[in-house]
Amino acid sequence: MASSNLIKQLQERGLVAQVTDEEALAERLAQGPIALYCGFDPTADSLHLGHLVPLLCLKRFQQAGHKPVALVGGATGLIGDPSFKAAERKLNTEDTVQEWVDKIRKQVAPFLDFDCGDNSAIAANNYDWFGSMNVLTFLRDIGKHFSVNQMINKEAVKQRLNRDDQGISFTEFSYNLLQGYDFACLNKLHGVALQIGGSDQWGNITSGIDLTRRLHQNQVFGLTVPLITKADGTKFGKTEGGAVWLDPKKTSPYKFYQFWINTADADVYRFLKFFTFMDMAEINALEEEDKNSGKAPRAQYVLAEQVTRLVHGEEGLEAAKRITESLFNGNLSDLSESDFEQLAQDGMPMVELEKGTDLMQALVESELQPSRGQARKAIAANGVTVNGIKQPDPDYVLNENDRYFSNYTLLRRGKKNWCLIKWKSK
């Protein structure tokens, strides 16, 4: 992405929700590289899909020659951002937050280049400046620059104040001051001139712009990316099992890949603009090709491949594709032990059984059939496969020959009802 028209290119992709003084920012970008930052609060032990758009936006700026600062909120994570939250957040211990800070910093690192010369990325932690600050310094040096009148009129806070069942604590109310000071601090330390974040961060970003101007007399800017919505109105980034995480131990690469494969036609081309680095011309050509092919669209596979590779690397992508292909064609011999571990983690329903269980009981225990009688009928009708092979004997007892890596057996009833058996060791 050329730096001179970067904002326009981001707008073409639908990646700009709001921007402060767009003309002045475009001029500043045209003059040469700037430093910019995005903050990630450790509210869990992993980032999720909602963090991916701003994180990739940092990467887009770095590719255009700018210097990204990834700020992990070791201090703000102890407080909790009230923005558009219906209720007060639960406070976590310092040890927990520090553990999450370390995990999130490691998660962010592969997306940015920390060794590429002048625009090498920087990792920062706001605990470095807040950890030793006393309350008097906070109130005198930061608090005096904030108007309570303006703070309570910010939309993110106003929504909480207007609820009869929920107020807002002074702790969460002060979050706005902390994030505002982050911007001023990073401006002084690293010359940061732009903050990016989700559109729910607009109030916090504008507070930081005002504070930086008051403390350092510098003009700085803010840009928000849209909160992603789906065409059908349902929440993006959620499955029946909850959030889709970037940590492979919380959401396996296979499950992650399948999430993107299942993207609706109405969303897929928009998501290619948000979550990949494909050129707009490529995306438009793919949309045209899909429209005229008369076949199932290819876009979902392109999207799944691109984003899984970005987040989980080539190895994670290959595993996800291998599992997908093996389940589709019924040939499980290509699967590795770690592939089965992914399936056991979250790839499909899983049940632990004692060795020596017969097939009818396994179908009942796995909830593929409601009773042994129904299980018998399904088996006799050739409707059940064991590891991809039809098993016609209702009295069949599952044995060691049916176990992959001495541990796993895959049952299927009909075409789409799966269950993975994990055999108990004793």
Curated annotation (Swiss-Prot):
The keyword Aminoacyl-tRNA synthetase applies. SUPFAM superfamilies: Alpha-L RNA-binding motif, Nucleotidylyl transferase. Gene3D superfamilies: HUPs, RNA-binding S4 domain, Tyrosyl-Transfer RNA Synthetase. ATP binds at residue 238. The keyword ATP-binding applies. A motif ('HIGH' region) lies at residues 42-51. A motif ('KMSKS' region) lies at residues 235-239. Its EC number is 6.1.1.1. It catalyses: tRNA(Tyr) + L-tyrosine + ATP = L-tyrosyl-tRNA(Tyr) + AMP + diphosphate + H(+). Keywords: Aminoacyl-tRNA synthetase, ATP-binding, Cytoplasm, Ligase, Nucleotide-binding, Protein biosynthesis, RNA-binding. GO terms for molecular function: ATP binding; RNA binding; tyrosine-tRNA ligase activity. GO terms for biological process: tyrosyl-tRNA aminoacylation. Residues 357-415 form the S4 RNA-binding domain. L-tyrosine binds at residues 37, 175, 179. It is found in: Cytoplasm. It is an enzyme of class 6 (ligase). NCBIfam families: tyrS (TIGR00234). Belongs to the class-I aminoacyl-tRNA synthetase family. TyrS type 1 subfamily. Homodimer. Catalyzes the attachment of tyrosine to tRNA(Tyr) in a two-step reaction: tyrosine is first activated by ATP to form Tyr-AMP and then transferred to the acceptor end of tRNA(Tyr). This is Tyrosine--tRNA ligase. It comes from Klebsiella pneumoniae (strain 342).
